A protein has these predicted regions:
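Residue-level signal for short amphipathic helical patches enriched in basic/charged
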Residues: 26-29, 106, 139
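Structured surface interface patches that mediate subunit assembly and partner/cofactor docking
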Residues: 131-155
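Acidic/histidine-rich alpha-helical segments that form the ligand environment
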Residues: 11, 15, 19-22, 54-55, ...
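Single conserved hydrophobic/aromatic residue that forms the stacking wall/gate
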Residues: 1-6, 10
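Conserved alpha-helical segments that form or flank metal/cofactor-binding pockets of metalloenzymes
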Residues: 27-67, 129-132
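Generic structural concept
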Residues: 35, 39-42, 46, 86, ...
């Protein structure tokens, strides 16, 4: 009964790997702030997978660790990375919305309540990344320098 939540755990692990790959990409290009921000994103995604697994177990299900597909390793530019991130976050939002729809159809109010926390978080994630994209597009290389410093301050 918790197959979809387990699949979301695997998806969050994939997301963690994606952000870690992006962190390494930025570090190799000298963008320490972007690298740090992406590493924090990776930790956040890993935490999401753990939270989902804990929820499945609290509800009597068995959490499982599944295989995670390889993630991209290269991007053309910082703009390309953040465009990828934005598309990815929108996709994650769609997946979470589907989980909420299933929980609603099954009249599983506990799962609906649990998942709404993720829905709210995704609104923030998409807005944050859209803001970064806007700044990169508006300011070019100067914006990259300042954003690198700004995003590096995230703990």
């Amino acid at each position: 009964p918790y197959r979809r939540q387990r699949q979301m755990c695997i998806r969050d692990r994939w997301s963690a790997n994606l952000y870690l790959s992006m962190s390494y990409f930025f570090a190799a290009k000298g963008y320490e702030g972007f690298a740090s921000w992406m590493k924090a994103q990776a930790h956040e995604e890993s935490d999401h997978a753990d939270v989902l697994a804990q929820y499945v177990m609290k509800r009597g299900g068995q959490a499982k660790v599944g295989a995670v597909d390889a993630v991209p390793q290269e991007w053309a530019s910082p703009l390309d990375v953040f465009e990828h991130v934005y598309k990815h976050e929108c996709h994650v939002s769609e997946l979470i919305d589907k989980l909420v729809d299933v929980a609603s159809a099954e009249k599983d109010k506990a799962s609906q309540d649990f998942l709404w926390g993720f829905v709210r978080e995704q609104v923030e994630e998409e807005a944050t990344v859209q803001g970064i994209l806007d700044k990169i597009k508006l300011g070019g290389d100067v914006a990259l320098y300042h954003l690198d410093i700004q995003l590096g301050a995230r703990k």
